[in-house]
Amino acid sequence: MSHILDKIDTVYPFPPKPIPLTQDEKAAYIASIKQLLNEKDAVLIAHYYTDPEIQALAEETGGFVGDSLEMAKFGNRHPAGTLIIAGVRFMGESAKILTPEKRILMPTLEAECSLDLGCPADKFTEFCDAHPDHTVVVYANTSAAVKARADWVVTSSIALEIVEHLDAEDKPIIWGPDRHLGSYIANKTGADMLLWQGECVVHDEFSADALRKMKAVYPDAAILVHPESPASVVELADAVGSTSQLIKAAKELPQQKMIVATDKGIFFKMQQLVPEKELIEAPTAGAGATCRSCAHCPWMAMNGLKAIETALREGGEQHEIFVDEALRVKSLIPLNRMLDFAEKLNMQVKGNA
């Protein structure tokens, strides 16, 4: 059973959209980035939700495209001394937590995440302190400070198993920050959960009514849904899962058409694996001009070629991720707890967003 806190509607200030580059400008920045990666002993690591040209460049230069935890683990294993993380701030922090000896750069430190912004460490700590009998479980889409307050850090691929484990021990749970994912897990497990009221601005916009109408147009299509979406949307899904799990589902499901309810940045990698299938964007509640995110994270869009080139060329405090060592060590404890639990289950832990 879940206990849901009063929701506080938050309108996040979206960053301005990057100015489009000409083809000549793109070519010049790509050439410069390739040279700088070699000169700086650096590797480009990109999230599935970044623009297709960024994902393509990461793969072309021997880097990596994946979800948040996969990105951090790849950076930990790669011999490069500098990691350039094309994603949002908590992803750079996660890389620094796992690999403190390396230099972690980001195209911009202003690339935020609404889940992170909606879960300030001071307020979350205050809430946890008010419920000392609860085990604190936080989603990976959080700051290092929030992770440090947690007993467990989880990703969407292993959250069910960990919550089931805690529920079997009769432990009440505080879950943060995504209310939709928390509600999904509570309904699946029956666990006693207090849910922090955060949401992803992209997934929160998907509309069940609009999705039903689209399904009527494409009756033979499979519906793929990220569990950060509202419950009414999740109920319509043929497959529910993290970014990596949805890509896998697109490959394994027999349908030749896929309606995909997650950030449309995922289409680049998904289409690589299923070039013969038709991928269709799931509709958002705004339907066109009135949507806010329009199925693409506005902060992910900040990871452009110009910003990547500048980060590699100039570095500095505007681009480098630092995590206080005491905080890093503390946040590593719940993260390692998840990894150890997964190893015992012989699971390959995938990321979330």
Curated annotation (Swiss-Prot):
One of its GO terms (biological process) is 'de novo' NAD biosynthetic process from L-aspartate. Binds 1 [4Fe-4S] cluster per subunit. It is found in: Cytoplasm. [4Fe-4S] cluster binds at residues 113, 200, 297. Pfam families: NadA. Gene3D superfamilies: NadA-like. It comes from the Bacteria. It is an enzyme of class 2 (transferase). Its cofactor is [4Fe-4S] cluster. Its EC number is 2.5.1.72. InterPro entries: NadA, NadA_sf, Quinolinate_synth_A_type1. GO terms for molecular function: 4 iron, 4 sulfur cluster binding; metal ion binding; quinolinate synthetase A activity. Keywords: 4Fe-4S, Cytoplasm, Iron, Iron-sulfur, Metal-binding, Pyridine nucleotide biosynthesis, Transferase. HAMAP family: NadA_type1. Catalyzes the condensation of iminoaspartate with dihydroxyacetone phosphate to form quinolinate. NCBIfam families: nadA (TIGR00550), PRK09375.1-1 (NF006877), PRK09375.1-2 (NF006878). This is Quinolinate synthase. It comes from Vibrio vulnificus (strain CMCP6).
